[in-house]
Amino acid sequence: MTTKVAANSAAYEAIVRAGPRVKQLQQVHAHLIVTGYGRSRSLLTKLITLACSARAIAYTHLLFLSVPLPDDFLFNSVIKSTSKLRLPLHCVAYYRRMLSSNVSPSNYTFTSVIKSCADLSALRIGKGVHCHAVVSGFGLDTYVQAALVTFYSKCGDMEGARQVFDRMPEKSIVAWNSLVSGFEQNGLADEAIQVFYQMRESGFEPDSATFVSLLSACAQTGAVSLGSWVHQYIISEGLDLNVKLGTALINLYSRCGDVGKAREVFDKMKETNVAAWTAMISAYGTHGYGQQAVELFNKMEDDCGPIPNNVTFVAVLSACAHAGLVEEGRSVYKRMTKSYRLIPGVEHHVCMVDMLGRAGFLDEAYKFIHQLDATGKATAPALWTAMLGACKMHRNYDLGVEIAKRLIALEPDNPGHHVMLSNIYALSGKTDEVSHIRDGMMRNNLRKQVGYSVIEVENKTYMFSMGDESHQETGEIYRYLETLISRCKEIGYAPVSEEVMHQVEEEEKEFALRYHSEKLAVAFGLLKTVDVAITIVKNLRICEDCHSAFKYISIVSNRQITVRDKLRFHHFQNGSCSCLDYW
């Protein structure tokens, strides 16, 4: 008996020494078979765990099948390992085999399987696992519930995530973080911020994971005050400014209009990775500082920084497009394909078309798309949308109409394409065609996306939509805006009304333009603050008239006004914009 135990122990030590290396594990396995230990449950379990760690899935399954009656320990080993290694399909498959073998799962089983369902975004399967956990008596287990909050969040079911969270008898910091992250990642930034406040009221102290999600939520909404408080908290509490936190702070300051502060954070980071470099390059690009973006990209290459990836190249190409750096953009695109052997995706192609089109190289941009067409890559609507924007900018209306019609053929239910075609017709004076397009949109119930603008005043955020009258001080805001526009007209402002429906009188067009959401937001901001810069976040692109008006408003108010629209930043000061009207 002693000899058998010693042999078993020696075999176990041999497996441990082999580690997660497939060839050595296979040699040990062969030795076990020869020496009569090939069906030892404990030894096979260890072999299976290490084989799975080596991602040798086929070999793992072969070993698993050699066990005559797998028990709960063995099933949990493979389920936990496949879940941890992000092999969700295999994890779910072993869970199903476990059930068919009449082996009872544990809380660890459910936690791992639910995580895999989250990785797959498999809402229906995950709900089934949730029901099974409840029936099995693990519905209120702390680990299972925390995994369920993450699962429902990743599947976009925040109502389900909130219900699970609210039923938790004991809420952990992990569960709170999952809920904050879930709301933020599903675009519900305000809800994420509210959950953070509830977390603090419940006596939980935030950690780095909390702040990464919270900073992203602040960046979405433009809540710079809360974001700055987080930064100060990190400093005062002596928290480590790790890569994730540093990158989140760069994104916060960038998206809230302070690219200088973003660079300060970047320069103070002890450790950086490709995500941090890309975030800083993107910050320069969206603010119109294309040359700085290219210089930082060159520094990344020359100073032995991290190897740029596809996202990095999107950031630098976009920066070149916004700043009119055509030669630099061509060079970057060439280096991407030749030096780094990266395959450009739709985003890179869109940047190239946008860059060439904005700069007036319409023929080259059009040729670029047709070269992609020959390889079957020109069906992406975003390519033609970028080309259409260039046609509108350079008043090539005939080509614009052709492209707009092509877009409508690709996506007939996208109201944005119909609106762009209508605008092209309006600019070219074809009022009958404008009416035809608008009537067609009405018949097909195609509605233009509602625009809104957000402004933060005294640590509170306020949202405005076009013609908004929901604010308590609507009357005062509208009167102040009237005065503001009148003062702007005295120094040369003239409303740009070409794109407003041509069936109405000029006075009505001006009225329609006057109450755009960003104008209401800037009027409110100027009313409620003194001698401070105004920052507005808009969900759509700023229109040509508002862009013109804001240059004049910056003069009459003697304020700096920053607008973050769908694509970039505009910094208005003393009658000019940082984009140099190149947008």
Swiss-Prot record:
PPR repeats lie at residues 71-105, 106-140, 141-171, 172-206, 207-241, 242-276, 277-303, 309-339, 345-379. One of its GO terms (biological process) is RNA modification. Residues 490-583 are annotated as: Type DYW motif. Disulfide bonds: none annotated. Residues 459-489 are annotated as: Type E(+) motif. The keyword Repeat applies. Keywords: Repeat. InterPro entries: DYW_dom, E_motif, Pentatricopeptide_rpt, PPR_At4g14850-like_plant, TPR-like_helical_dom_sf. The keyword Repeat applies. It holds the Pfam family E_motif. One of its GO terms (molecular function) is zinc ion binding. Residues 383-458 are annotated as: Type E motif. Belongs to the PPR family. PCMP-H subfamily. NCBIfam families: PPR. This is Pentatricopeptide repeat-containing protein At2g33760.
